[in-house]
Amino acid sequence: MSVFTNSYIPVNKYTRPGLKLQGVKKCVLHYTANPGAGADNHRRYFSNAQVYASAHIFVDKAEAICIIPLNEVAYHANDIQQRDSAGNPYRGVAALKPNANFLSIGVEMCLEKDGSFHSDTVERTEDVFVELCNKFGLDPIDDIVRHYDITHKNCPAPWVSNSQKFVDFKNRVKAKMSGKSVSKASPTKPTTSSPSSSSAVSGSLKSKVDGLRFYSKPSWEDKDVVGTVNKGIGFPTVVEKVKVGSAYQYKVKNSKGTTYYITASDKYVDVTGSVKTSSSAPKTTSTSSSSSSIKSVGKIKIVGVSSAAIVMDKPDRNSSKNIGTVKLGSTISISGSVKGKNNSNGYWEVIYKGKRGYISGQFGSTI
């Protein structure tokens, strides 16, 4: 019997692109950085989140849920935290180059309200990794890695600051795979600091309702909505409270340090800690739908064509219009990937001349 239950989120371009893994060389350990939110909270969040992020399995003290099939890509470990002198992203695990998302399984550990790992969460996560290592023929000592090991992101933060805890975790997984009995895992204490925090930061936020909108800038306009959060999900960092028109919003940051704005009404959100209030929202400048307003998540190299790949206006090679071409061997920035229609390989969503376009999945290779 499996340690985790399968409850897959719908295929979508943001959190479950429907692309097939190229293999499983490692299993990657993460933490949610979202105190008090359990596995099902995160399943519901990633069901309709409009951010390019996800993981395969979420684990809390009561259950483990697999939200993306283990033969599909999840967006969990290809972020850019550092670059070398040549401008190349730091990639610390050679076996997962150039893009860990296509070669690994991502597992997220949920946090208690105080920011700690419950001992039952740790123990259940061990059992999840036992099952994964057996399934994919992996050695837990060499093939379980932290998100930190791949990109230098501070994740899972408690086991970056105390790496011995991570070593102990892998040893316990190894022992369980060998049929040895192990003592109950001890809880991990909350971390005392976060690299993304500043002196102005003293709170965290959770939504009281499903489908609560958040914005790219201080605004109430539909065009500035970048996603929604469900009940129990929110942001680990509240920077300040700002006035937007006649009402207030919180300036918040997600676990990656990206800034957003969300209503400050206590009807819709709960905030822990004290948060300073700014007299007015920062000034913003309007943007057009140019390349600067489309976020790049990486690049692909054009492969598998005789001379050039066709760029389409929508992800359906049977009914789309051709808007251009990209030559064989050239590179192009992507904003994600989608399943689309009439192609089992899906489509790369590319940034072509400042606009979104689509290239058949088989004609692009991540770099």
Curated annotation (Swiss-Prot):
Where is the protein localized? Secreted
Quick check: keyword Secreted in the entry?
Answer: yes
Q: Which InterPro entries match?
A: Amidase/PGRP_sf (IPR036505), Amidase_domain (IPR002502), NAMLAA_amidase_2 (IPR051206), SH3-like_bac-type (IPR003646)
Domain N-acetylmuramoyl-L-alanine amidase, by residue range, is 24-158
The record ties this protein, via SUPFAM superfamilies, to: N-acetylmuramoyl-L-alanine amidase-like
Q: Give me any GO biological process, just one.
A: sporulation resulting in formation of a cellular spore
GO MF annotations for this entry?
A: N-acetylmuramoyl-L-alanine amidase activity
Swiss-Prot/TrEMBL catalytic activity: Hydrolyzes the link between N-acetylmuramoyl residues and L-amino acid residues in certain cell-wall glycopeptides
The primary location reported for this protein is secreted
Q: Which residues form the SH3b domain?
A: 202-271, 298-367
Q: Give positions of region: Disordered.
A: 178-204
- E.C. designation(s): 3.5.1.28
Keywords from the UniProt entry: Cell wall biogenesis/degradation, Competence, Hydrolase, Secreted, Sporulation
Gene3D superfamilies found in the cross-reference section: Peptidoglycan recognition protein-like
**Keyword Thylakoid among record annotations:** no
Q: What class of enzyme is it?
A: hydrolase
The Gene Ontology CC terms held by the record are:
extracellular region
Record's superkingdom? Bacteria
The family database entries (Pfam families) matched by this protein are listed as: Amidase_2
Described purpose of this protein according to its UniProt entry: Autolysins are involved in some important biological processes such as cell separation, cell-wall turnover, competence for genetic transformation, formation of the flagella and sporulation. Involved in prophage SP-beta-mediated cell lysis.
Query: What family name appears in the similarity comment?
Result: Belongs to the N-acetylmuramoyl-L-alanine amidase 2 family.
User: By what name is this protein known?
Assistant: N-acetylmuramoyl-L-alanine amidase BlyA
Species per Swiss-Prot/TrEMBL record: Bacillus subtilis (strain 168)
Lineage per the UniProt record: Bacteria, Bacillati, Bacillota, Bacilli, Bacillales
**GN (gene name):** blyA
